[in-house]
Regions:
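Glycine-rich flavin
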Residues: 1-49
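Glycine-rich beta->alpha junctions and the first turn(s) of the following alpha-helix
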Residues: 84-166
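C-terminal helix-coil-helix/basic helical segment that borders enzyme active sites and/or dimer interfaces
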Residues: 166-180
């Protein structure tokens, strides 16, 4: 991410996280005049474990990526309320920020505009697709499908969704290959 945005790399041994998930609970704002962030950021995986976080925050020009030290004054880890099943053992909760010093990373909107963002999103979509295929497998193997019209209809819906998703992922992969 830092290389995509023409920023200096973090020091060797620095453990970093990217907290860019948004939702109604996300109230984090960057104040350009003071160079600080304030508000809440949900779904911060690795909170309490990492040294540095790259965090998306709202600002006057939309959204902006900032870099901050996670042990800075004003950083408060909320009790974990969300348990990321795929990352058991990694704390993932809301972090509250109160006028925490933050350095802008790139221009406003640059995090979402960089090519690597869409490449990463495609990888996540492929993972979700793989999970959907695995979830559909028992239905596809079920002997009920032969004798149960409703089960056969549901399997047809599942197959259509999986096939259209696969087609979109192939199209996305071709676009990424053409636009690295």
């Amino acid at each position: 991410i830092l290389a995509d945005l023409h920023q200096t790399a973090l020091g060797a041994g620095t453990l970093a996280a990217v907290w860019a998930a948004e939702g109604p609970q996300a109230t984090l704002c960057y104040d350009e005049e003071t160079g600080t962030v304030s508000g809440a950021k949900p779904w911060c995986s690795g909170a309490g474990l990492v040294d540095v976080a790259l965090v998306t925050a709202r600002c006057g020009d939309g959204s902006r990526l900032v870099c901050l030290l996670t042990d800075a004054p004003g950083v408060l880890l909320q009790p974990q309320s969300w348990h990321a099943t795929g990352m058991r053992g990694i704390p993932s909760g809301t972090v509250q920020f109160d006028q925490v010093r933050a350095e802008p990373v790139g221009a406003p909107g640059a995090y979402l505009a960089r090519p690597g963002f869409w490449h990463g999103g495609a990888g996540i979509a492929a993972c979700w697709y793989g999970a959907a295929v695995a979830l559909a497998a028992p239905l596809q193997r079920s002997p009920r499908v032969e004798d149960d019209a409703q089960a056969a209809a549901l399997l047809g819906q599942v197959d259509m969704a999986l096939q259209s998703s696969a087609a979109l992922l192939r199209e996305l992969a071709a676009w990424i290959d053409a636009m690295p």
